[in-house]
Amino acid sequence: MEEPGAGFILNMTSDSKVRAIVGRIRGLAAKTVPPPEMSWFDSQFDPEDAEGPFLPFSTFLITGTAGAGKSTSISALYQSLNCLITGATAVAAQNLSNGLKTYCPTIYSAFGFKSRHINILPRHGRNAPARDMEGIQRNELCKYWPVISDILGEFTKKKQRGQYEHLTGAAFGALAKMGTPTLWTTNIIVIDEAGTLSSHILTAVVFLYWFYNSWLQTPLYKSGAVPCVVCVGSPTQTDAIQSTYNHSMQKHHIQECDNILTFLMKHEAVSRYVDLNHNWALFINNKRCTDPEFGHLLKTLEYNLDISPRMVDYIDRFVVPKSKILSPLEYVGWTRLFVSHREVKAYLTALHETLSLNQGGATAEADARLFTCPVVCEVFTDTFNEYREAVNLPGLTVTEWLQKNLCRLSNYSQFIDQDLSAVHIETGEESTKVTYLVKYVKNSYVSLNGKTKKCICGFMGTFEKFKTILDNETFIDAHSHDQPEYVYSFLNTLLYNGMYAFHKHGLDAGDEGYLDALRRLPIPPNITHLSTFQDALDQTEAALLNPESDIFYHMTCAPPSASSASLSTLISFYMSLKSVFLQRLALAVSRFGRDFAERTFQTFTINMMIQNGVDFTSASERLFGLLGYASNVDTYKLKGYTFIPVGFGRFNQAELSRDLRDKMPVVVVEDPHGFIACLENNVNKMTEVMENGDLIHICTAGDYGISSKLAMTIAKAQGMSLSRVAVCFGNSKFVRKSHVYVAISRATDPRHMVIDCNPLKNLEEDREDNKTSKYIVQALNNPDTILVY
């Protein structure tokens, strides 16, 4: 029997403490109060002018060393309690989705934040400093009220007032279990990586919980169930920033602000109200990487301990020349981490130039082909002129505005990281259309940046892999919850179209004996269109006259569509096609050996050709397949693109003009099981919010909604575990401790981590970190704190 690893043992020893965490959170969630009167908060209310009722809440804090199991402990909460699991960032939400095998939204998405709210500026808050919890809550509410009030307006239009007023608690509980948790179906809200959120987000979550439940008149509101916000993260790893945009200067202003974790620790009135001394759990030992010296290093940074010469020497062993990290030909397949977006873009540009010269030959990637796809932006003339007048910049041109706002255009896709260049500008009366080319690498891994529709249209893998999928019925189990007839119809089409692969191999091998045996394999009667023995003879003779022709297609019917056949008929057809596939595979393996099962097998819903390795083309006028939403759980491998029109089931959507939509292909990706899917293009609307509150829709941009995993900023990697990581701290004279901490703690194995310098030799003195560490050390000495080793 294999001996359990150190990480497994550490997780098992922490089991009892995690149970204690679940128990305390369950106790907090059971608290009730007289429901606050929410009718105060109507469309005329503003916390800057009037004081509303205090909104009770409770919090539980989970902090600790990077990789110590903070995020993993969330799975215990998910299994034990009815709770809404969210991430502070898209990456954190994706990691949670991956671990829990369920959809976890960002906290912004959970409370109703939309892309248009990005440009609504937070206020500075009331001038008078608040010393009690009521005043602090009002101050925090003031900061975010412009966004909150807009969310309230949209919610009250969409949801009927008193919608759940007459439901019993049991009926409401059953209804809540049928769907995904929301702010009005549970009072336990978990936020992973909460250290990246500004403090006012906590108050926004509390306020919107009470407002939503009051508006819908849920049993939660009527019973006065107090929201329990579980904040997970590390205050020494992360910073919260606040971004504002100066329209007159066309420039971003970014400044640090209190994050939720430090807000709970530092403000005495807040920590006393939430009883932080009793509602705090600290995870101590790193379980992501169980190397003792590595774990000691992380604890030293976490608790702001003195850095010994021995520790500096330990870090020296990871240092390699910066040129090796920046060279795409070194450390192939490793994820690069950089401090700034500019460095990420520079590395990707260098990688793409190397690939264009080597065509993947020197990169140890069998098919790392470089290809480009257009990204399009359409700036509307009338609204752009209105914007120029509003900000008093009459000389501002479209190209200048685009150059300064390109990173803001993509709310999800992070244009600024991508290697793209403008190739075409077309100016018309109604709009200016700008086309950029963005470079991608075939077979590189990408993540999705939003909720993306997909159309599964094929399979690329091996015969053995497809057989395993059929035997285990994993695909059917994963996709047949709502309309199983479409799943069976899709698989029938793949099986039917894929049968020719067996015949083609026999032709290429020139093996007449194998082809003859293939013809003799029986065909189930429910999939054949032949009614008499003479019909069978005629079709066999026709097939023999054309050696390229597979007799299977002469003898069988094309699979019926999901709309024209019953589920039982589709399942019967599937079982027969599966039987034929397995018989053909067994025959081929017996004839050509076990190696045949590992040969490439490709099948699509239409007759597909792949030109230049990346361009999926067909004589068919439309590409159809199984529709669904692409999973944030999965990492996708980029395979190419297609200009074949794909039906994503959306109608009357014209965010982009027709000629721009025609310029953009859809990207083709492979999921972890080998199924090929097209991803719907991502469309972003750029709406500026003026100081007087007016909304101006200036521009619409179309992109692909994907981010490369070849390189990213250290901030974006927050919460990730990376098997091979190369960190470049750049040319900064001083390195921030939080950057060092996050970057090196991503590694799961110190043997597969390299850095370009020893950051411990030039750490930036950060007084804020020292303050935070003081509270953490106090918690370590507090007997009421739950310590998880």
Swiss-Prot record:
Protein name, entry field: DNA replication helicase
Source organism (scientific name): Equine herpesvirus 2 (strain 86/87)
Complex formation: Associates with the primase and the primase-associated factor to form the helicase-primase complex.
Family of the protein in this entry: Belongs to the herpesviridae helicase family.
Record localization: Host nucleus
Family annotation (InterPro entries): DNA_helicase_dom, HSV_HELI, P-loop_NTPase
SUPFAM superfamilies per UniProt: P-loop containing nucleoside triphosphate hydrolases (SSF52540)
Gene Ontology terms: cellular component: host cell nucleus
